[in-house]
């Protein structure tokens, strides 16, 4: 078998090689380049949306300081109170027009209870301002056996400081029983009520 000659000579092959255009590698698509970069998350977690701890702490401290200031300015402590057992007798006729009118509709006990409730409220204010020391302590009572047997009993809560002041005035030696002291206190409260009533009507 014979050797075939190349169709192109060496010189022609070199000229063809020089005339070929250079192979240009295409650049990567933009989408491909961008896909290699880290993308920010589309949705933030709840922890990412929370405020910075330092800011939250400052806000909490400010609110707490405001609350402490308000509490310091307001007094929420109620005064200590004590229960006092009270008793009183109805007044004699014409001592109190209010009582005389009430017994036309209610029993003597019920009528005196209605007045005593009001009298004790007023007398508590007198204990607070000290005016009870110059006020009357008693009033005329009936002399009949039936009317003497009527005794109204009740109880009321008083501030301890006011009861101490009343005891020093009505029982300076501290020898009275609790019920005896309560009778004096209720009698004085009614005496003040009847005295004011008479002064208003005169």
Curated annotation (Swiss-Prot):
Pfam families assigned to the protein according to its UniProt record, in alphabetical order: VirC2
| Gene Ontology MF annotations | DNA binding
Annotated region (Disordered) at 21-66
**Looking at the keywords, is Amino-acid biosynthesis present?**
no
Q: Name one GO biological process term.
A: regulation of DNA-templated transcription
What does the UniProt keyword field contain? Crown gall tumor, Plasmid
Query: Which InterPro entries does this one have?
Result: Ribbon_hlx_hlx (IPR010985), VirC2 (IPR009841), VirC2_C_sf (IPR038473)
Extract the Gene3D superfamilies matched here: VirC2, RHH domain
Which additional comment does the entry carry? The Ti plasmid contains at least six transcriptional units, designated vir loci, which are essential for efficient crown-gall tumorigenesis.
Know the name of this protein?
A: Protein virC2
């Amino acid at each position: 078998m014979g050797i075939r000659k190349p169709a192109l000579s060496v010189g022609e092959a070199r000229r063809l090689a020089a005339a070929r255009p250079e192979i240009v590698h295409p650049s990567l698509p933009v989408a491909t380049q961008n896909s290699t970069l880290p993308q920010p998350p589309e949705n933030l977690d709840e922890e990412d949306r929370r405020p910075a701890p330092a800011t939250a702490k400052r806000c909490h401290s400010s609110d707490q300081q405001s609350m402490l200031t308000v509490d310091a300015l307001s007094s929420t402590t109620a005064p200590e109170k004590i229960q006092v057992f009270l008793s009183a007798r109805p007044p004699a006729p014409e001592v109190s027009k209010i009582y005389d009118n009430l017994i036309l509709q209610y029993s003597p006990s019920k009528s005196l209870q209605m007045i005593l409730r009001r009298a004790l409220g007023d007398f508590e204010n007198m204990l607070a301002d000290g005016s009870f020391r110059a006020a009357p302590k008693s009033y005329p009572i009936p002399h009949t056996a039936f009317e003497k047997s009527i005794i109204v009993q009740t109880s009321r809560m008083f501030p301890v400081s006011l009861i101490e002041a009343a005891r020093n005035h009505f029982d300076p030696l501290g020898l009275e029983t609790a019920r005896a002291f309560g009778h004096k206190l209720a009698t004085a409260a009614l005496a003040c009520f009847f005295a004011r009533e008479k002064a208003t009507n005169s």
